[in-house]
Structures are given as structure tokens and as C-alpha cells.
Amino acid sequence: MELAASPDAMLKWLSDAGLAEPPILSQIKARWKAAPREADALLETAVELREALYELFIARIDGRKADPAAAKTVNRHLSGSQAGSGLALSHTTFRWQRPAGKLAPEALLRPIAWSAAGLLTGPRAQKLKQCQDQRGCGWLFIDESRAQNRRWCTMGDCGNLAKSRRHYHRAKAGART
């Protein structure tokens, strides 16, 4: 969701994350053609939820009390319900099922809030970490490493940059001596 800069990009992210089926997305896109402001409003709501979740996750990582406004935002998403929504079996996996007909677009965000709440209240919450890249990456991850000592969001991005920076500075310091 971090890179979803437009309503269409947000719908693609929701689809890629398995949170919205193509018929639902088509229904919402058609609705947005008639009411484009609704698309922008949902994107604003999604960004608001993302920022609230980030605050809660960072508070958990830092061991501090979270901003009550962030918890209130997430709780607002947790408390809503859409009759007929639930889990559907898809071969050997599960996916979110939405009712046909009128779907409140903000209901697409509900599984995100539920998943985050499950993470924050479950045993994996203690494995939640923030990337330690010096450029200020800020991405969050769950440290599943055996020693619980992972430092970067990905080794391919921030990890390699940090290691190459460290190597450069060591080589530069060695050249001076």
C-alpha cells in the first residue's frame, strides 16, 4: 500500500494482495467513473489507515504508548461490517469473499485493519522491526531469522547498500594508513 499513489494503483495493490476479486474491482471502477471524488476519498481513507497502523507498529517497536487517535482510526475500520463478507475456500487456500451487489468501498480496507490487529496482539508482535538503513527507509518487517538479528527490510536493497557503504569506509580508512 506504501506505493499506491492513485486510486487505480490502490485497487491494483488490493488485487495483488488478494483482498479484492476482479468483479468487485470492476464494480468499484464503474462506480468511480460516475463519482470520481469517491475514489479520492477512499484513497485518503486508505492513507489515513496506513499512517495510523504505522504509528501503532512503531509505538510497539519503540516500546512506547501509541497515539490514541491512531488506535481510534484503526478501531473504526475494525468495527464496521459488511453482511455476507467472510472467508471463502479457493482450492487449498482462503481468500476474502465479498457480497455481490452494493459493496461499500471502504470495506476493502477492513481485512488490512484485521490483519494488523492480529499482528499487534499476537505472538509475532515481538518480531516486528523497522529497517535500520541510515537513509531513513522506515519500512517495517517481521524478523523471522533464527537469531532474531535481522536489521534491514531487504538484503537486496538496504542491506546491500549498508554493507557496501561500510566496506567503502573501511577501504578508505585503510588507504589513509
Language model features: what each stretch is:
Residues 1-130, 177:
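Short helix-coil boundary/hinge micro-motifs
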